[in-house]
Amino acid sequence: MKTTAEIRQSFLDFFHSKGHQVVESSSLVPENDPTLLFTNAGMNQFKDVFLGMDKRPYSRATTAQRCVRAGGKHNDLENVGYTARHHTFFEMMGNFSFGDYFKYDAINFAWEFLTSPKWLALPKEKLYVTVYETDDEAYDIWNKEVGVPQEHIIRIGDNKGAPYASDNFWAMGDTGPCGPCTEIFYDHGDHIWGGLPGTPEEDGDRYIEIWNIVFMQFNRLADGTMEKLPKPSVDTGMGLERMTAVLQHVNSNYEIDIFQTLIKKVAEIVGTTDLGNKSLRVIADHIRSCAYLIADGVIPSNEGRGYVLRRIIRRAVRHGHLLGAKETFFYKLVPTLIEVMAEAGKQVKEKQANVEKLLRLEEEQFARTLERGLILLDAELANVKNGVLSGEVAFKLYDTYGFPLDLTADVCRERNIAVDENGFDKEMEAQRLRAQSASNFGMDYTSIIRVDGETKFEGYTNVESLAKVTALFRDGKAVESVSAGQSAVVILENTPFYAEMGGQIGDSGMLTANGLHFDVKDTQKYGQVFGHIGELTQGTLSVGQIVNAQVDAQRRQYTKLNHSATHLLHAALRQVLGEHVAQKGSLVSDVGLRFDFVQPEAVTKEQIMEIERLVNFHIRANHPVLTEEMGVAEAKSKGAIALFGEKYGETVRVVTMSPFSIELCGGLHVERTGEIGLLKIISEGAVAAGIRRVEAVTGEEAINWLFNQQTILAQSADLLKSDIPSLPEKIIQLQDKVKKTEKELQQLKEKAAMQAGSDLAKSAVKINGVSVVTHQLDGADAKVLRVMVDDLKNQLGSAVIALGSASGGKVNLIAGVTADLTAKVKAGELVNVMAQQVGGKGGGRPDMAMAGGSQPENLSAALIVASDWLKTMI
């Protein structure tokens, strides 16, 4: 019986034997594709190739792509573990043709791999295929060429209410590449319920789709017209877990080897013998998605990708709690995961320490509130009358205890109770940006400039070149010429201008010819061409014209300083903080650099100093900065670090600054590190959960920054009548003096309050025989108000007191009730009556409660409302 790892390797070996390039799985974080939250299909990494915006050195490819399908509030997460085939993480085997082979080969390849005794040897009589209703070509290939009998071929038409809206017609979007598809199904046997595709029983588990082959042969225009593509392509997907279930003769994906090993390990760790418990399946699934997401740079947080990861982790932790886990357990599954994933586990193994650390920290954080949240939820569920948990309670669990909505829904599902999601949405309105980041990932690919050919980049050695204008664009539309005063994007056949990539800003400069001047303000890359963005200030510029392209050399030099310094900074961060440090983003400009990186804990001042010291040591060492092109495998063997979010071809450019820093990089750099002069870190802090940011300046900017700091120190010393070395001691003396003065002032305030309290006791009024004091004391802080309430209680013996003060645009409120009256009046209720009038809220004990507010102009009205309310309560 083949293992999952063997089936994965067999697929890749088969297609390699058919002339396909074996391409590594791309990251779960889509590279340069903001339309996607996570990689969810094998074709994602080839999207630009299918769109004609990218070219590869091969026309056939095969992959074992890691995928995650979980995101947004409305998803299948709650079904994972409860059905046979729902997963947050899965592997999609795929083979792709980029204008190479088409239907005949794609169909025959799939059939050979599935049925040949050399490969999977599936019984042909167990296989059924579907084709798009009008795709006679695919039908005939299956029937006449492959030999599949007619009764095993099903035509599927437009079954989704619109033309070309069908299970057997695939489209990338409303416009763009699209085409019919053919799907292959496996019959698990009549002992399992379910019907053939296209029948009312098709959702059963008897006939399971194992392979989908998409024929991209049309380009759909905005008016719905279908144009034939000049070079049709093929995109296929075979679910590895589903295929393994077929070959291992089981009906559920959770019964295959990798899941059974994980399930048994979970049971061992949490101490259960019930291997059929669905919570084990949930945890076994979730460790795969969580470990690979963290390995690919995602950090648990409250927004976007990080929030999806947090939801999955917390769901797993909750199911561990159901199984009786008494301590952190989730991270302990990582070694077993690496083992069962075999070759595909190397991504997690390389980041194992960081993966385990982040999983443990997240579980520990959630464990602090999980028990209390479940107690609240259990109490609320016991009181549910109509079978629906209120959205208000669901939101409180989210806001106070960190329960994602789907976790609450998971618990409710076990009690056959629904959740009022509309009510939850209303409560979430003020925090709508959380968990909605997924919907903000969008880009209209039709607006991107497309030009055939490519621009030859000459900027590694030149800052000036003669170049031919191959295209001009205004407002996204191609034009033949541009006149003075007009903005445009100029495409050149060759250019010394660097287009923004890898965090480095695009070059600026000018294009000139006789009587012509075009100011280049930025340079961007569109597919394989460079767009020079700017304004024509003089003359007329036309397609076909020869111009002199001249980069702003000084701006570029400053940018080069910062780019090389960024490499040294990255290396220093990894050396001081640990190898878990990975780039999450960067900005390299002519005025400074910004570097975002993975770091779950705050960076200490001592660590910052050591990082800065290391960088400047290697600057002073004046290392040569060497660039070399080589294969990806060779670069990795030399220890080269790849940067986050960048795509690399088969040949990569490696930038080396002694053994200290070796990175893959296509950017511009100095010739020796000594040119950088100096690096000064000017800020460091958190930008998101688990992500830190360092900002720094170099060269002349660093010197200017230090001069400015020196000036500030000198001015501060003058103000304090001190010299600079004595400033810390002088400031400490000043702080001590201020503290002493503040203490004396507080004592005076309290003394005055005691006197005022005596006067207020005389102003008490009787409401139904109870002494009541309501008064406004502007300038009194919360501490003074507490002293006054205690004093009034002592003087009056039995009383209700409501005091308020306004200062600096803020309101302080306090309510006090003597013990004999708390059965009638509670201080917390009284203070909230007042707080509502001043835009605040508060709380406390029945005998003493405080509140704040932001509307001092309503304070007098609040005290009147308090008196009126007391008349109804006493």
UniProtKB/Swiss-Prot annotation:
Catalysis performed (reactions): tRNA(Ala) + L-alanine + ATP = L-alanyl-tRNA(Ala) + AMP + diphosphate
Binding site for Zn(2+): 563, 567, 665, 669
UniProtKB keywords: Aminoacyl-tRNA synthetase, ATP-binding, Cytoplasm, Ligase, Metal-binding, Nucleotide-binding, Protein biosynthesis, RNA-binding, tRNA-binding, Zinc
Any single Gene Ontology cellular-component annotation: cytosol
Coiled coil feature spans: none
Subcellular location(s) per record: Cytoplasm
Enzyme class: ligase
A Pfam family of this chain: tRNA_SAD
Keyword Cytoplasm: yes
Cofactor binding note: Binds 1 zinc ion per subunit.
InterPro entries documented for this protein: aa-tRNA-synth_II/BPL/LPL, Ala-tRNA-lgiase_IIc, Ala-tRNA-ligase_IIc_anticod-bd, Ala-tRNA-synth_IIc_core, Ala-tRNA-synth_IIc_N, Ala-tRNA_ligase, Ala_tRNA_ligase_euk/bac, DHHA1_dom
Known function: Catalyzes the attachment of alanine to tRNA(Ala) in a two-step reaction: alanine is first activated by ATP to form Ala-AMP and then transferred to the acceptor end of tRNA(Ala). Also edits incorrectly charged Ser-tRNA(Ala) and Gly-tRNA(Ala) via its editing domain.
Family to which this protein belongs: Belongs to the class-II aminoacyl-tRNA synthetase family.
Domain notes: Consists of three domains; the N-terminal catalytic domain, the editing domain and the C-terminal C-Ala domain. The editing domain removes incorrectly charged amino acids, while the C-Ala domain, along with tRNA(Ala), serves as a bridge to cooperatively bring together the editing and aminoacylation centers thus stimulating deacylation of misacylated tRNAs.
Name assigned to this protein: Alanine--tRNA ligase
Biological source species: Actinobacillus succinogenes (strain ATCC 55618 / DSM 22257 / CCUG 43843 / 130Z)
